[in-house]
Design a protein with these regions (language model features):
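A short alpha-helical cap/connector motif
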Residues: 1-165, 169-193
Length: 193
């Protein structure tokens, strides 16, 4: 009988060293995010960059919605795997980080594939619903307090064979610790049920 391999820092480093190399602009985004202090935690991991790339490469979605842009690492990771006629729409309320993301998209020469909506996510989602937009893939990685709302509303935007990816559902492993009563941990735990 086999058992699951625990992924520690050594294993993670080994995987990173033997995986697909990041696009130079992905590396730049990561270096930029390193200067942001605690906000860096909003960034997806390198493994997630590879995962999002792989998902878009394998499933070839034509239309992607991302809820939560930050500085654009996840958008760029998905965009690199897309075919030429595919598009990403990404929503974020933060004008400053959205501008940073836009600049990185231009640098990577993918800005024509990515539309940024600067608005509260609920407003942006509702506008897309009113426009009857439909997406093959929806990636949710925004404020955790509204995950349930984003998830429920996303079904109004999802194509029949589409799928939803939700980041942070394990919340760095915190959700399994029943003694952890931190606010965001409880929200994620509730979302998962």
């Amino acid at each position: 009988m086999s058992s699951n391999l625990p992924i520690n820092k050594q294993i993670e480093k080994y995987i990173d060293e033997h995986s697909l190399k990041l696009h130079p602009v992905q590396d730049e985004i990561i270096k930029y995010n390193d200067t942001l202090g605690k906000k860096k935690k909003l960034q997806i991991s390198i493994n997630q960059c590879h995962f999002l790339y792989l998902v878009t490469k394998l499933f070839k979605p034509k239309e992607i919605l991302e809820i939560g842009t930050f500085t654009g690492l996840s958008s760029l990771s998905m965009c690199i795997g897309l075919e030429n006629n595919s598009k990403i729409t990404t929503i974020d309320k933060n004008k400053d980080t959205s501008l940073v993301a836009k600049n990185f998209f231009e640098k990577a020469k993918v800005s024509e594939k990515i539309d940024i909506i600067i608005d509260e996510a609920i407003n942006g989602i509702n506008k897309l619903i009113s426009q009857k937009k439909l997406f093959d893939l929806i990636f949710i990685d925004a404020d955790k307090e509204n995950y349930k709302k984003y998830y429920e509303l996303s079904f109004n935007l999802l194509k029949r064979d589409g799928f939803i990816i939700i980041d942070n559902v394990l919340w760095h492993g915190e959700v399994v610790d029943k003694n952890n009563k931190e606010h965001l941990t409880e929200i994620i735990r509730d979302f998962n049920t």
